[in-house]
């Protein structure tokens, strides 16, 4: 009799385990406007997805949509997170300069001494001054590239006088203001349009980070590169829809917090810098 009762109890326990509902799986859509060969795709985007799945025991997963699969045009990246077309989005605050006036102060000449210093400064004032700019979103990462350089299609720039009247691509309003002060005519456009614009002469050059030489193949239309400009980095961010973040369980939010923030930002900034150095090793007159 005891054996029967014991066996019945074990059977009931096993059935209870089978009947228990499995933890709901959450899949976060990640909108990336760059291709999978981009320098941050595997070591940052994919690694975050892998690490988050591991930390949450598979309860939270990230599905990456690269090359603008959730909508073309990097200018709309921030709004894709706001409208929850994607739960997470990667982009540039400079494309929506009016939304991030304080964040973009980091791009002004003389504010920082390098990409690591700039990234640390952003996160030092994130809670007190910058988070209020992220309406309906939360910053998971925010970092800057090394100083911008002038990439020119057919004219070397040796002095500021050489820039007079030339059409130069700018990434943001702050960069455009600087180019105007230098005597150039700024033309704001997404990075994805620079290759064609330089190749066809729509612009004479571009003010961009060195990583763009390889990422956007600007090494092809670029004949001259001018370095040594005052520190003018490009700011990049990874943002998450605020409601999507709140829908995660407390322990899964903690897991995401652990994997993002300053640490992720510093690593991303350094990877961009390393890639920029590689781009400068091409056959271009400097």
Q: Model-found features: residue ranges?
A:
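An amphipathic, aromatic/His-enriched active-site/gating alpha helix that lines ligand/cofactor pockets
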Residues: 119
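N-terminal secretory/targeting leader peptides
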Residues: 25-116, 125, 132-286
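Bacterial N-terminal signal peptides that target proteins for export
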Residues: 1-11
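Cleavable N-terminal signal peptides
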Residues: 11-12, 22
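Residue-level detector of alpha-helical hydrophobic segments embedded in or interacting with membranes
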Residues: 15-16, 104
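Sec/Tat signal peptide C-region and signal peptidase I cleavage site
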Residues: 18-24
């Amino acid at each position: 009799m005891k054996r029967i009762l014991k066996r019945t109890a074990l059977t009931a326990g096993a059935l209870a385990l089978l009947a228990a509902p499995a933890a709901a799986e959450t899949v976060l859509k990640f909108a990336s406007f760059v291709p999978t060969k981009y320098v941050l795709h595997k070591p940052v985007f994919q690694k975050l997805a892998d690490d988050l799945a591991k930390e949450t025991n598979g309860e939270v997963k990230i599905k990456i949509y690269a090359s603008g699969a959730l909508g073309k045009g990097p200018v709309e990246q921030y709004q894709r997170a706001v409208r929850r077309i994607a739960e997470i989005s990667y982009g540039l605050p400079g494309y929506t300069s009016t939304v991030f006036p304080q964040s973009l102060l980091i791009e002004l000449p003389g504010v920082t001494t390098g990409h690591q210093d700039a990234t640390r400064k952003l996160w030092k004032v994130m809670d007190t001054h910058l988070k209020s700019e992220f309406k309906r979103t939360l910053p998971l990462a925010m970092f800057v590239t090394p100083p911008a350089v002038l990439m020119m299609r057919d004219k070397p720039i040796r002095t500021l006088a050489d820039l007079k009247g030339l059409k130069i691509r700018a990434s943001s309003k702050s960069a455009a203001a600087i180019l105007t002060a230098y005597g150039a005519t700024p033309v704001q456009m997404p990075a994805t349009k620079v290759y064609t614009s330089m190749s066809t002469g729509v612009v004479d050059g571009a003010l961009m980070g060195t990583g763009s030489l390889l990422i956007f193949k600007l090494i092809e239309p670029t004949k001259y590169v001018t370095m040594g400009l005052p520190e003018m980095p490009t700011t990049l961010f990874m943002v998450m829809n605020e409601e999507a973040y709140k829908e995660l369980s407390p322990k899964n939010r903690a897991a995401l917090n652990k994997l993002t923030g300053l640490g992720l930002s510093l690593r991303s900034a350094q990877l961009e810098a390393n890639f920029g150095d590689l781009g400068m090793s091409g056959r271009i007159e400097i």
